[in-house]
């Protein structure tokens, strides 16, 4: 996890001006009732350049250090017994450790499918299917290098497909054929090193050996120290022979004792260095195991393939693409990106003692890394103190946008969930991108194009009470709906982290945006509670006084019904007002044949704002009461249906008179409306009785 954070930080720190990492975390279109909140980054690369790395599995070869001879008095004077005790101590520690490390490597490698042996189906008449073993060898490699080879029964990497189908989705048969060829060619290459790239017949596939220099150096160091200890033993024997008979007995023993002490120190130094090498090897093997665990999760591991190796392949690919010309390019030149993608195919060969990792480097002309935004819808009230509100219906769950802002694509939650990866997601089913010149409703909202929004979006008009709630739109900012506005209800602002701060109150507001300061909380009794905020605490809490001032979005769908574009040019989808916006707007009631249905919270009760305004325009009246509607029913005998319109902008023409609708006019309408139904009922009874006569 820590390594992933480091790689992501490296990727972010090296991003260019037009990079997915510099795109905003949130895009506010609250005046339309939508908030775009940043989701995961996805990769959209249609073509893939495949490269296979061969990684050698560590081989821990340890030969126990042999004892020096200690069968004469002269050798004993040279401290041979003390030296042998040191050798026994080292061997006693190292041999069990090497055995344990070998067991751990085998355990780590066990889940990885082995390409050396597998079973292929073979039909034997009525006896049913029998199975035979196929092994990696010249015959198979000759077959697989045939350009007409299509795999037939599955190829020796069918086990890879079976393994990944349960873990992260099957690799394509094209992937398997390419890595088959890579393994066969690597088996024939003797002197290949990590700097040498071998290209297959295909233009977009290469392979190389990624040597584990660290492990190779440790193995060489262990062999070297073992050799030096053996040389010391021989030196002791030679020394004892040379000094014998050359001096008197006493002088001989003193000379040998001094030489033996010196040699003992030399042996101790080499053995301690040997023990340090063993400890380093143990840590290196642990890194290899961590790399295998990362690989099993579907990602490339830097413990197995170094950043320099990936960078070298990136340079090769970039050079090829430059030579070809055109607009095709790699998704990203930064090696850190490819350690974050879940797109590797891997297998092992026990015969070759190697691990094979095929990495796909996505290539694109448009798209590449794209930022996704989750579309969060909210109600925007017609007025603060009324239940009528608007909301945009039928929006996608996510909108993916390219860093240059020229292309987009829409995703559902299930489609995003099916993509693999943590920081950067790779989707199995990639799609073509749409240009922002051909917009959908979601794209128009992202671009804040009011003309296209009014044309393409299904804006719904609802007469339901929005329950009290606080919706978090950024770290410390909330969109608030209150059902108790206008009742004198108040909220409490408490700041327990600020010394000597006395709790204050604020009036309840509806469809407002509130930023809660660091160290404070907002308590709305009986409605909601915004807990203590710890975001943005860069200031010294004792040196400032928090202030919470609500801001108010405006209902742009309604405003466009009463004003032309020239009046609204300065009001964008993200502009919030510091005051409550006021406009005398008439009540717009959805008309149904059965009035009892109009109180049900159903799809019928949620009406299209376009249709309602069209009906209002066609009839040139606003129904102020149920009695007025009954009068029309009695005198017209036609069903009242909301007619369709082409665009909302057509509906908004010639409606400026609605702004003059006042309280007096509404009362007059109600008074006349109470008289006319009575006359209509009397008239209906008269007609009915006359027909019976």
UniProtKB/Swiss-Prot annotation:
Keywords: Coiled coil, Host membrane, Membrane, Signal, Transmembrane, Transmembrane helix. It is a single-pass type I membrane protein. Residues 18-666 are extracellular. Residues 688-693 are cytoplasmic. It is found in: Host membrane. The chain crosses the membrane at residues 667-687. The keyword Membrane applies. The keyword Transmembrane helix applies. This is Putative transmembrane protein ORF68. Residues 208-256 form a coiled coil.
């Amino acid at each position: 996890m820590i390594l992933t954070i480091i790689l992501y930080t490296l990727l972010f720190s090296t991003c260019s001006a037009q990079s997915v990492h510099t795109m905003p975390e949130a895009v506010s279109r609250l005046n339309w009732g939508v908030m775009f909140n940043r989701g995961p980054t996805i990769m959209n690369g249609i073509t893939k350049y495949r490269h296979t790395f061969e990684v050698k599995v560590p081989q821990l070869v340890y030969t126990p250090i042999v004892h020096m001879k200690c069968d004469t008095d002269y050798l004993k004077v040279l401290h041979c017994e003390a030296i042998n005790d040191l050798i026994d101590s080292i061997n006693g520690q190292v041999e069990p450790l090497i055995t344990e490390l070998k067991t751990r490597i085998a355990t780590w490698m066990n889940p990885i499918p082995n390409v050396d042996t597998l079973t292929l189906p073979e039909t034997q008449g009525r006896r049913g299917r029998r199975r035979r073993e196929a092994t990696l060898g010249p015959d198979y490699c000759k077959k697989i290098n045939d350009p007409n080879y299509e795999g037939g029964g599955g190829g020796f990497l069918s086990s890879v497909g079976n393994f990944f189908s349960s873990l992260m989705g099957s690799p394509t048969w094209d992937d398997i054929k390419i890595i088959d060829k890579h393994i066969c060619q690597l088996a024939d290459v003797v002197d290949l090193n990590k700097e040498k790239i071998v290209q297959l017949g295909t233009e977009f596939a290469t392979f190389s050996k990624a040597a584990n220099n660290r492990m190779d150096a440790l193995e060489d160091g262990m062999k070297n120290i073992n050799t030096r200890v053996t040389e010391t033993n021989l030196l002791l024997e030679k020394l004892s022979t040379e000094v014998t008979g050359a001096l008197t007995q006493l002088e001989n023993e003193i000379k040998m004792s001094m030489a033996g002490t010196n040699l003992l120190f030399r042996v101790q130094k080499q053995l301690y260095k040997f023990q340090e090498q063993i400890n380093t090897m143990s840590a290196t093997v642990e890194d290899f195991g961590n790399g295998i665990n990362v690989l099993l999760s579907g990602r490339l591991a830097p413990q197995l393939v170094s950043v320099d190796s990936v960078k070298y392949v990136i340079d090769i690919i970039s050079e090829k693409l430059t030579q070809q010309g055109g607009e095709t390019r790699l998704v990203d030149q930064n090696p850190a990106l490819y350690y974050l993608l879940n797109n590797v195919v891997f297998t092992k060969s026990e015969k070759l003692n190697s691990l094979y990792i095929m990495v796909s480097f996505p290539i694109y002309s448009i798209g590449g890394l794209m930022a996704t935004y989750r579309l969060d819808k909210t109600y925007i009230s017609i007025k603060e103190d009324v239940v009528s509100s608007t909301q945009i219906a039928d929006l996608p769950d996510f909108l993916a946008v390219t860093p240059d802002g020229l292309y987009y694509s829409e995703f559902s939650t299930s489609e995003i969930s099916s993509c693999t990866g943590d920081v950067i997601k790779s989707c199995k089913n990639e799609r073509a991108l749409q240009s922002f010149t051909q917009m959908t409703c979601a794209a128009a909202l992202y671009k804040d194009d009011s003309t296209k929004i009014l044309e393409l979006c299904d804006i719904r008009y609802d007469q339901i009470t929005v329950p009290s709630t606080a919706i978090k739109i950024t770290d410390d900012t909330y969109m608030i709906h209150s059902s108790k506005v206008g009742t004198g209800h108040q909220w409490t602002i408490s700041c327990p982290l600020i010394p000597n701060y006395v709790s204050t109150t604020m009036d309840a507001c509806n469809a407002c945006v509130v930023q809660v300061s660091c160290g404070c909380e907002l308590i709305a009794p009986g409605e909601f509670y915004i807990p203590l905020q710890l975001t943005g605490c860069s200031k010294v809490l004792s040196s400032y006084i928090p202030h919470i001032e609500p801001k108010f979005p405006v209902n742009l769908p309604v405003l466009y019904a009463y004003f032309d574009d020239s009046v609204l040019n300065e009001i964008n989808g993200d502009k919030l007002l510091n005051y409550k916006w006021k406009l005398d707007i008439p009540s717009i009631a959805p008309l149904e044949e059965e009035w009892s249905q109009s109180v049900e919270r159903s799809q019928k009760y949620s009406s299209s704002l376009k249709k309602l305004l069209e009906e209002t325009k066609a009839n040139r009246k606003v129904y102020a009461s149920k009695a007025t509607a009954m009068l029309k029913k009695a005198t017209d005998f036609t069903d009242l249906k909301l007619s369709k319109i082409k665009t909302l902008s057509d509906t908004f023409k010639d409606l400026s008179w609605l702004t003059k609708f006042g309280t007096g006019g509404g009362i007059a309408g109600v008074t006349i409306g109470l008289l006319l139904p009575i006359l209509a009922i009397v008239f209906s009874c008269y007609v009915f009785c006359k027909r019976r006569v």
